[in-house]
């Protein structure tokens, strides 16, 4: 068929026949570029078979392909070459009360259709091949046929006529043909019902058509209950057709199937409690208890009765306990899965309530079965009637869109199995009883929240209720009829739902004008939401004066005071006496969430305790900005927890903290704790912006890399500790300490501290350093002057934003063999890790080594006078006063080594140069470092000597 064609031509042909249209440009070529022809064909077909979205074109292709598959799997009379021959043979089976066998039906039917056998010949063969029929007396045979054909005994005339026919040599097959023709012709009024039943049971279904869903599900349930497998296509076709015939039931079908070799081999041969336990466990998914075994043992030894009882008891159960409900839902899911029911459906409310209505799986409108509901993963619901839609069986539902405008009650799975549903709500009147998982409910602009009656009952789980707001003049409008309850768990609600209104009245008198203001809020319409999401907040404060609107220009301000009862009225000029709101006990008790971009959001009157925290759950982008203003003495800490699920970096933007405390016994916001975590391979990013003179400690933990910028406004920060983080950090500290820490830290490392104390007192040296500690991973730490940095393990990069003789940086654990030092003022990088070497860099100049004895002598001389500045002090102790400086050089000591960068190239140490102390780095290791950068170096390497100056 495909001889001489290229792989692309073959794949294109298969795609076109599968989808009924040509493939998108480049799609097939890309598949072949990344796989074989066989794998590409598999992808093309499986993508269509497994599609569970709502694109009309793809759904049309899927429906067309399903029809082709159904015609192959359920060929009906196509196997026999036509309907007539099959109908004739089915009539023979019907008239003698034998269940048809597909092989015989197709074999004899094909011969009739081909003309190799007449109907009469086929009928004669049919009787002669069955000894049980041949052995009957003529009288018994006639009575059998009439009982099966008409549901009655033959009249005396009919009995005499046919027995006489047979007694005179008439063929029994011919008699069957005659009765068949009679039933296909005109019958008396009393036989019309029998005729209709005959025609129903002997008319083969069209190719690709199969019995109704209820029959299919019954067949599937038996196969799941005994052999514990999915029913095959032929079995489904045969046995669902069997159930559609008169007098057949689930029990009779079970009785037939139990006798089959496969069923006997796979459990049906068991007896007593062993059989009951086998079926019960297969159906329920858990073993039966002793009481349950005893219950079904009362049914006796009829295995078919026991089987159908176990199946029906579970499928029709009205129990409400989670265990039974879960078992019921699971069995319906297994049934639906075995019948390859679609996992996506467009639905509407059923007029009588209950399960939703749709055309899924049948192509015609019907109320979905429990099994159809159980397999749903994606659904679009038109909530078009004020009734109830039951989606509780949908334990695997992941995505639900609710359209329409009616006050439809939508019930989701609440038995604890569903992990959570992403619900998009385009209906402002819906009543949503969400699942017991972690639901994410997004209310869109299509839902009229300003005038709607929507109710959101989110139940168990850590749920999220989002709304982008509808503010056009800075104030969101929420109907007084809208309600939401987060239920159990830690739940989040968009700040846009919560409004603030200042209602002011004025009274004029001889003493002037007095004002009264009432703070109003709709916070009471919402309960059990522990966190407030500030992402996308566009609200503000509404205000009136004597009933007329007042312009408020506070921007996107969220007053947490409407929740804690501490709201303020600074937005208006004349508030007068204020009546505040009552505090809410169930809103915002665990602080705030940032899920997306926050456009200059101001949060005021923030409480302490667990409220003083922000959870970052999504990428807000670098342009996002939130500032928190706390109540006075509210808290001593603020926690920022990154907890996003992502595959790209999560940026919290800029966070500002404004706090105040009482002068006596006040509580200052001294600690900012950042947990950089999440799920996925990404980094977290945060900019601590604004000004806060109270924060002194920034602690970093978590298992995700953190890129942290601490603004210069955090002038009191003295400790930045990331040692509890396990992934690494990029810390930019724009905070400088004060004093002469680089000198004192150096001198404190020597045994002659009596001299150093005298020098500190003489020169007034003091130390108020910023301490920065990295992680055990590869960190980047950027520090200002008067900082002491500990990188931790890993290959770290230390960036000197500024490090001078007056305010230098000390690095306590610099490893020349793996770490890198970057001087941002000169643009130079220094290391001995191999990345910079003699081929691409320049070795540092070596200004010598200052021994302990030499230093002690120098320090003793300093005490006697002659040193008037820190520059002179360093020139003295480093022994570089009388030698010209190269562009980059080092001086060693037993305590570590100094790095000096002559930035202005004047050959001497001054305030324009970079000076940093590498504590613990030996003279030899320091001298072996190389540097490179865009600036040309000056000078040459100095001869190594032991400095001993008087």
Region annotations inferred by a language model:
Residues 2-9, 13-42, 55-90, 101-118, ...:
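Solvent-exposed, low-complexity segments and loops of surface/extracellular structural proteins
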Residues 49, 86, 180-183:
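Catalytic cores of secreted/periplasmic lytic hydrolases that degrade extracellular macromolecules
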Residues 177, 255:
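Extracellular LysM carbohydrate-binding repeats and other cell-envelope/extracellular binding modules
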Residues 225-227:
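Asp/Glu-centered strand-loop micro-motifs enriched in Gly/Pro and often flanked by an aromatic residue
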Residues 239:
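Extracellular glycan-interaction surfaces
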